[in-house]
Amino acid sequence: MSLLLSNSVLVGPKFRSSRISHASASLDIGLQRATSPQNASVPTCFEETKGRIAKLFHKNELSVSTYDTAWVAMVPSPTSSEEPCFPACLNWLLENQCHDGSWARPHHHHMLKKDVLSSTLACILALKKWGVGEEQINRGLHFVELNFASATEKGQITPMGFDIIFPAMLDNARGLSLNLQLEPTMLNDLIYKRDLELKRCNQSNSAEKEVYWAHIAEGMGKLHDWESVMKYQRKNGSLFNCPSTTAAAFTALRNSDCLNYLCLALEKFGSAVPAVYPLDIYSQLCTVGNLERLGISRYFLTEIQSVLDETYRSWLQGDEEIFMDASTCALAFRTLRMNGYNVTSDPITKILQECFSSSFRGNMTDNNTTLEIYRASELILYPEERDLVQHNLRLKTFLEQELSSNGFIQSCQLGRNINAEVNQAIEYPFYAIMDRMAKRKNIENYNIDNTRILKTSYRSPNFGNKDFLSLSVEDFNRCQVIHREELRELERWVIENRLDELKFARSKAAYCYFSAAATIFSPELSDARMSWAKNGVLTTVVDDFFDVGGSVEELKNLIQLVELWDVDVSTQCCSPNVQIIFSALKHTICEIADKGFKLQGRSITDHIISIWLDLLYSMMKETELGIDKSFPTMDEYMSNAYVSFALGPIVLPALYLVGPKLSEEMVNHSEYHTLFKLMSTCGRLLNDIRGYERELKDGKISAVSLYIMNNGGEITTEAAISEMRSWIERDRRELLRLVLEENKSVLPKACKKLFWHMCTVVHVFYSKDDGFTSLNLHGVVNAIINEPIVLNQF
């Protein structure tokens, strides 16, 4: 779709150009507003949608900026100040006025009237400067007069620098003898707002103020110190990769590098320019980010790897496109670090230091950037990143304050539920939300328009489009069908193995399966999911058996049966309960081992038995401590308690079923055991914090009570819990570091991810309640397994 064309007669040959070149036509694709979610339908062909998304990796479409194109059109020729340097831009303005007299984006948002006013006035100034397009000028002036009230309307989105740039353009209009009939009171309000903004800026001596003024230099008038602006010139000749600022700088100083930048932009895009250029790295990272956040990245692994490698090369080279833009830097850091690349957090720390050390905020950092920086600041892996810890806490407080004061109502992205996104980021940190939970929330909060706003609005299909949404919804629902069938299979398995006859045991098959489906959701990983879920059910049964259901004789009998393995259950089981539990254990271990043998090419039965024995021994030790009423040291307690937390049988056998080969050397390596210990320690401590009061009433020990006791009872419960949380934080960060690290790693990444997935599971289960007693979990389970996403519900 092209911009609406004027019916007026075009000017002479020297201003003519083809209506829209191929390059600018591709720009106009970005101007189209994507179909709204209410009207979108799931594609009839899954592969066609994937194909359209794959093409985004090979092009970076950016919407036309009429505002920036107007400023480029104002640039005089280097050889004659009486002629335009870029007549094609001028002709583009003549051809692309809307029927209402504005130069607006097609289907522009009703909250973008200030943007439309600014763009329209800039186009009028460009035409008037070169004495062409009288009819278009008059229609444009009429539009400005009719809509001038929007310039001071509080409900409208205010582009960056609007309160300074727009009044400056009005001054320029008067200087060019343009007769604008404006309502005096509204004009005075506008001037008052400009003076307030200038006063606010002048009260700050921060570097950010200087950057802000340089960025909006076209609105600062002839008194502006252009030489000071040029210190922000980038290697590509631009100022802030912004055509309008760069055009104004060339007009003032005739800087050849500025001109080269503008020429290159027009060479690429034809007769109209975008609001920001280049934006390749950010656009590609947005594509990757969309795919990862919506759960469909596995369909584009080759393309994503190429983007990551190229971004990492740019990072190592100190590319200005990354490091001169806070949003791109934060997005690059988070994406690279989460994908195992070795990147320092120093640039993020620097951005945060500049933000918090400045008293002048709110102009250069939009809501999207703030959220990106917050997400990046969560990825703390190393002890020496202490500054990042403090900055993350401060930024979290800032976001909470903005939420409570409705500070995000005016979002930098139209149609985006920024409040919901910020609330999710705060309430569910990345380590405390299971993968599928996060994906569903991201789908529900997704905005296909994704218009961004700086000095003017701009968008790109790489930022967001209906294909991302429709593919993710269809994929989520496809997986959900498989998950529902697997849950039915698990429920049949419970009955077939008579586990439902154990009256002492909690019935938690749905929750156990949910934790598997919410983390390892891909259809091809069915065996790993079922291993995880079945062992989850069995560990719950065994835990209840040791806790309330079995006598000491029965517990010892169960251990002995697993040790002997090849036994006659009809004669060697001391009770029906022991027979049911051991038979279910043996049947399940053999089933998993058979599947593992096919994938691994070697027997894994003995290892799975050993994993279960480790758990049984640790549970027996806890039972004996309870009988003896003895109190171990904290170290003694934790050396056993991380094993008795019972994550071993759930996670470790599943490692054999996710794809990669796991040799005997790998499972005996220290990395394997360290990952298990870190994951299990986090779970144990979270459990002990949540269950502290209950355990205390029952006369049982926990990490919290032992810590208080080991410190002579001289510290409070709150202090003990605070220490436990610090311990969890340290181990969680070390776990994530090991999972992401590739250079010195022995275990395949697909296997290491399961340790992290389980860490998120325990954070969810114990975030507010004691594990399975969480009232909110029922709704979450339904959302992941039972309730499909309906596209028209958004």
Swiss-Prot record:
Its EC number is 4.2.3.19. Pathway: Secondary metabolite biosynthesis; terpenoid biosynthesis; Plant hormone biosynthesis; gibberellin biosynthesis. GO terms for biological process: ent-kaurene biosynthetic process; gibberellin biosynthetic process; terpenoid biosynthetic process. It is found in: Plastid, Chloroplast. One of its GO terms (molecular function) is ent-kaurene synthase activity. Its main location: plastid. Mg(2+) 1 binds at D543, D547. The keyword DNA-binding does not apply. It is an enzyme of class 4 (lyase). One of its GO terms (cellular component) is chloroplast. A motif (DDXXD motif) lies at residues 543-547. Its cofactor is Mg(2+). The Asp-Asp-Xaa-Xaa-Asp/Glu (DDXXD/E) motif is important for the catalytic activity, presumably through binding to Mg(2+). This is Ent-kaurene synthase 1, chloroplastic. It comes from Isodon eriocalyx (Plectranthus eriocalyx). The gene is KS1.
